[in-house]
C-alpha cells in the first residue's frame, strides 16, 4: 500500500476513510515525515464542518420531504401513500440513518483522533451500523427501478397483485440485504492500540474486500437500475406515442359528434381528455424523477469508488490529500435526493405550504385530485 494513502480504505466507506486518512496525516506530521504535496490536506476543523453540514442538510431535506408527502396526501384525502412515495420514504429513512449513525459517529471519532474511547464491542457495532445505510440506499434505488419496471413494463402482472405489497416487498428485501452485506464489518474491525481499526490478514484480503464493497454498493446496483430504466424508457416512449395518436383520433371523431350536441357533453369530453393527459404526465414525471435520482447516485459515488479500487490495486497512483477531497462527493448523495424530488414535484411542495392559495383552474384541479386520489394509482 502507498506511502500516503495506505489507510484511506481500511474501512471502505467515505465516512470512515476521512478519519483513517486524517489519523495517518496526524501521525505523519508528528514523525516529521516530509514529502511533496500538490495541495494542502483539509484541516480538522474543515472536516468537522463538512460532517456537520452533511448531517444538518440531510436531516432538514429528508424531514421536509416526509412532511410534504404526508401533507399532500392529507390535502388530497388519500388514505395511503403511492408505491413511489413509499419507496421514497424508505430512501428518506436510509438517508437520515446515514446522517445519524454513519456521519455522526465519524465526527466523534475524528474529534478524538488518534484514540477510540469505547470497548471493542462498541468498535465492532459502530463499524457494522455505519455501512448499513450505504448498502440500503443503493439497494433501495434498485427497488425503485424494479418497481417502476413492474408497473410500466408489466402492467397486467402488476394489476394481479396489490400495488402496495410490491414496494413493501422490494424495500424489505433491500433492508435485509443491507444488513447481511454489513456483517463482515463485525469481523474485520476491532479495537487495537487504542484505535478502532481493521484486522486484514493479507493485502489480498484488503484488495478483495474493497473491490467487492464498491461493486456491491455502487457498480452492480447502478448497472441493474440502468438496465431496468432502459426498458422503462422504451415502454414509456411507446406508450406516450400511442396515447397521443389515440387521443388525436378520438378528438376528431368526437368533434364531429359533439358539434350537434350540448356543451355539457363537450365539458365531459374535455375532462376525460385532461384526465388521460394527466395520467401520461404523471407517468413520465415519475420516470424522470426516479431516473434522475439513480443517475445522481451513480455520478456522486463514482469518484470515490473509482479512487478506492485504484488504491487497492495500485496504491502509489493517487495522492492521499486528493483522495480526501474526493471522499466529500460520496457524502453529498444523502443530501441530494429530497431536493431532486422537490424539483420534479414543485406543485406538491407549494401545496404543502399552509399560507399558499391554489391558483389552478377548477377543472384541472378536479382532474388532478381524481387521478392522485385513485386507490389504484401506481404513480
Swiss-Prot record:
Residues 70-95, 146-168, 229-289, 344-379 are cytoplasmic. It comes from the Eukaryota. It is found in: Cell membrane. PANTHER family: CARDIOACCELERATORY PEPTIDE RECEPTOR-RELATED (PTHR24224:SF6). Gene3D superfamilies: Rhodopsin 7-helix transmembrane proteins. This is Nematocin receptor 1. The keyword Cell division does not apply. Glycans are attached at residues 32, 199, 319. Receptor for nematocin. The activity of this receptor is mediated by G proteins which activate a phosphatidylinositol-calcium second messenger system. The activity of this receptor may be modulated by ntr-2, leading to reduced intracellular cAMP production. Plays a role in gustatory associative learning. Also plays a role in male mating behavior. It comes from Caenorhabditis elegans. Belongs to the G-protein coupled receptor 1 family. Vasopressin/oxytocin receptor subfamily. CDD domains: 7tmA_Vasopressin_Oxytocin. Keywords: Behavior, Cell membrane, Disulfide bond, G-protein coupled receptor, Glycoprotein, Membrane, Receptor, Transducer, Transmembrane, Transmembrane helix. One of its GO terms (molecular function) is G protein-coupled receptor activity. Disulfide bonds join 123-196. The chain crosses the membrane at residues 49-69, 96-116, 125-145, 169-189, 208-228, 290-310, 321-343.
